[in-house]
């Protein structure tokens, strides 16, 4: 009799199955949120900019992978420079097949497809001065900082007031300290060795070189593991870099307010299914990167 009732009322059966599916998805989302502290708790990787092996491998990020997004403080992000510095407490720290953390961020803090790339180094203000706070909102750096320096609208002065003129920079994990411009050779001497996986030719080295960079503001320099040293911040930071672009232009150093999260565990092998199919496979609101 029970089988006959189920067969005679397919609508009830459909509703029951849908409620069960929604409940299971809800429990999964809550469990992932409890683990990561982030919502949505994972992202779907579309780009091949982080792959280490064209055939895919466990332990690095491939197109099609699902990657957990951990809600971590900006100050806890470990850069490649720090993780390859023997004198740094984070020496040897590695994630997804290489030293340093992989972060997910909004391009220039704007809406759009986020980026998942590795944090290579951080530029931190050393000497700062107080800007002219009476200039209009659209004032240039020269107008805001008549005594020199680069205006950083988010860095705070000693009184906790946002907006300073940065005169010199530090780069933790490297020999760069109190420098007006940032030059770092990741050659294993001045900083940890970063292999560009490209042959040296003309003025292009086989390792990563940041040369006389004048950062727009404090933040992280980022790079896809498979991008052959073409950093997100463009040619002003590294010669020959095409950069990552948003509606407002080339991405600047990644600010804390742009950080979505830090890449955690991956769910591999889903890359064998084309990302276009993920609308049927992923959790609701799962973004693509």
Residue positions per predicted region:
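Catalytic Cys-His active-site segments of thiol-dependent hydrolases/isopeptidases
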Residues: 125-179, 183, 208-211, 215-233
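Extended, hydrophilic extramembrane loops/domains of integral membrane proteins
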Residues: 212-275
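Conserved small/polar residues in nucleotide/adenosyl-binding loops
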Residues: 279-285
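Intrinsically disordered, low-complexity acidic Ser/Thr-rich regulatory segments
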Residues: 92-95, 185-219
